[in-house]
């Protein structure tokens, strides 16, 4: 979930024990549970990872990134779906999966995000939000 609070965006720093490539900065996200829609997953993961539940999802924004990683002897493909939401909450309660968070202005967020594809998602979200 790309989450805006005024002109800032929330980024989380993953702990090294919770994921491959730990220590990277990214948006709140996670795996879909059986029976969930994509948006239900995004909202659940946002709540679990940040404690933030009072959000307004911005209708019409849906972005995806795809990538592969090595899973032993095979390459594993993954697609991540992002939605855009706004909140007035700024207090974050981190899950065990994360070690830090930052509410950053957009320029600083581009510098902090670890992966280029996440930067593109942020660009797309900013452009979409500016045009609604």
Stretch-by-stretch model annotation:
Residues 1-27:
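N-terminal strand-loop-strand
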Residues 3, 13, 82-86, 105:
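Short, well-ordered beta-strand micro-motif
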Residues 26, 77, 103:
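Short aromatic/basic micro-patch
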Residues 27-61:
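The catalytic Nudix box helix
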Residues 51-90:
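Active-site segment of metal-dependent pyrophosphate-handling enzymes
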Residues 86-88, 120, 124:
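Glycine-aromatic-enriched surface loops/turns that form tight recognition elements
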Residues 93-122:
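NUDIX/MutT-family hydrolases
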Residues 124-131:
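C-terminal alpha-helix
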């Amino acid at each position: 979930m790309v989450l805006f609070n005024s002109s800032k965006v929330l980024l989380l720093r993953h702990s090294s024990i919770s994921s491959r490539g730990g220590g990277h900065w990214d948006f709140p996200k996670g795996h879909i549970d059986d029976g969930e829609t994509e948006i239900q997953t995004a909202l659940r993961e946002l709540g679990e990872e940040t404690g933030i539940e009072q959000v307004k999802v911005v209708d019409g924004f849906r972005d995806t990134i795809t990538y592969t990683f090595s899973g032993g002897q095979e390459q594993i493909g993954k697609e991540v779906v992002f939605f855009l939401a706004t909140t007035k909450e700024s207090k974050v309660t981190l899950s065990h999966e994360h070690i830090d968070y930052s509410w950053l202005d957009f320029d600083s967020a581009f510098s902090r995000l670890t992966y280029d594809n996440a930067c593109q998602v942020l660009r797309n979200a900013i452009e979409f939000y500016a045009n609604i």
